[in-house]
């Protein structure tokens, strides 16, 4: 979907319409471009210049690379307290006071109850970083390009991020990427997670207790977390929350995530209206290195913020109309009866047998819901992880027996990516700790259910299989509290 008229004036005109402060003039909207486009390539050149200059700054400079990285999360090989003391020995140093306020503030990755702030927090961070690049480079017309990896033709890391010997692009190179990524292989072939737009199928922004986990949480899972674990290692790369923002591709990735949010809103998706959401304030750093506070209510529309996207995305076929949810529900117990309560995920596929609630005939209710064109969801609820397992988990509905299902199987529902698997311990300096609250995931499976019904399957309540994409790390034992099949 093309945003008409946004590019017509060209880059030269944009230069004339932006003030020296790095902020667009009132009423001026600048486009963020696909990095593969000519305009996006110009923006990438400016971005690389800015990254290089930021990396050359002292680590304690609020405008510098390390400080900006730590806003997202302090690396997990040190505590926040130790890092503050290292960079600011004087406890009254203004830089230390600012760092105390802004480091480790991406709460959505650390506390599942804060997941609804995932999108506005990153929008604020991205906007502040964008303005910082303008100030550092003098290119006041700069906008953050986006990496359009949802297009199958653009799933290789842009070549400029893979050029360690080129002086211009060297600041964009990192070694802590998965094998093959820096060789130009498509990341969905190298990694474990798909890169579709199924999150846009959700009709509501936030979690609903018995069905849809919501657009925000689903987008956080995929393609957001998918890209993180597909690109970088889970030790000190994009696949680890506390190291992710050290890879410059982080910024182009989140520009695309922001574009998906804006696209969902343009399609009719509504953001929360409660004051607890709208009134939340976060602190960042402005282009002068001073603190700046932003309220969620002020960043829900990109136009007043001075930017738009050159292209927006349509919702995928099979998306659930806005809004609605109620109805049919099935709950889980384990097929082997070895578990009472939570199901523990191990190194082998885990099968969970669903059973029907209520007294009316199971198949009749399924067919009634399907004939009424009601959407179906599969909800994976209460996921608790005390240690990063180093793998993702594919979800399959009613897999055929005696087969090893994979992502091309007819039973494939989606993938659970555990990018933010544990609470980041640097808030207290005590090291990682288990989640206090569990995460919820959901998948729209309307077409899958209808196809299974047409094939004569689902004559009995189906099973759900969770398949690790590799061998989990020793000691990792994720648990799932409940699984539900819901029709709205």
Tell me the role of every PLM-derived stretch.
Residues 1-19:
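N-terminal export signals
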Residues 18-488:
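C-terminal accessory segments of proteins
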């Amino acid at each position: 979907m093309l945003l008409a008229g946004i590019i017509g004036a060209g880059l030269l005109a944009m230069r004339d319409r932006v003030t020296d402060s790095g902020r667009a003039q009132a009423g001026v909207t600048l486009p963020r471009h696909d990095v593969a486009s000519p305009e996006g390539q110009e923006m990438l050149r400016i971005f690389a210049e800015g990254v290089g200059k930021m990396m050359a700054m002292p680590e304690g400079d609020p405008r510098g690379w390390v400080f900006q990285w730590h806003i997202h999360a302090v690396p997990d090989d040190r505590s926040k307290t130790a890092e503050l003391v290292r960079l600011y020995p004087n406890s009254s140093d203004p830089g230390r006071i600012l760092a105390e306020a802004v480091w480790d503030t991406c709460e959505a990755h650390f506390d599942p109850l804060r997941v609804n702030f995932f999108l506005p927090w990153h929008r604020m961070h991205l906007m502040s970083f964008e303005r910082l690049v303008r100030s550092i480079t003098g290119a006041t017309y700069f906008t953050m390009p986006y990496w359009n990896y949802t297009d199958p033709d653009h799933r290789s890391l842009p070549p400029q991020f893979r050029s360690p010997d080129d002086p211009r692009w060297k600041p964009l190179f990192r070694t802590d990427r998965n094998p093959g990524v820096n060789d130009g292989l498509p990341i969905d072939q190298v990694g474990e997670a798909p890169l579709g737009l199924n999150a846009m199928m959700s009709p509501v922004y936030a979690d609903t207790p018995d069905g849809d986990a919501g657009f925000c949480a689903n987008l956080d899972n995929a393609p957001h977390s998918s890209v993180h674990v597909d690109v970088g290692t889970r030790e000190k790369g994009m696949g680890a929350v506390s190291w992710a923002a050290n890879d410059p591709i982080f910024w182009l990735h989140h520009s695309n995530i922001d574009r998906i949010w804006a696209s969902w809103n343009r399609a009719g998706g509504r953001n929360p209206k409660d004051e607890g959401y709208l009134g939340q304030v976060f602190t960042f750093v402005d282009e002068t290195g001073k603190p700046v506070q932003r309220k969620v209510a002020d960043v829900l529309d990109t136009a007043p913020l001075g930017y738009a996207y050159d292209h927006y995305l349509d919702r995928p076929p099979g998306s659930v109309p806005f809004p609605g949810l109620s109805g049919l529900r099935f709950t889980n117990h384990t097929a082997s009866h070895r578990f009472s309560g939570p199901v523990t995920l191990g190194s082998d596929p885990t099968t969970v047998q669903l059973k029907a609630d209520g007294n009316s005939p199971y198949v009749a209710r399924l067919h009634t819901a399907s004939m009424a064109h009601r959407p179906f969801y599969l909800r994976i609820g209460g996921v608790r992880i005390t240690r990063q397992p180093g793998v993702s988990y594919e979800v399959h509905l009613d897999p055929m027996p005696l087969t090893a299902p994979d992502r091309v199987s007819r039973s494939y529902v989606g993938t659970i990516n555990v990018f933010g698997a544990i609470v980041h311990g640097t808030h207290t300096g005590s090291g990682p700790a288990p989640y206090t609250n569990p995460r919820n995931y959901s998948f729209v499976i309307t077409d899958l259910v209808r196809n299974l019904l047409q094939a004569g399957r689902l004559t009995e309540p189906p099973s759900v299989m969770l398949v690790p994409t590799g061998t989990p790390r020793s000691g990792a034992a994720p648990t799932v509290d409940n699984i539900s099949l819901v029709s709205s």
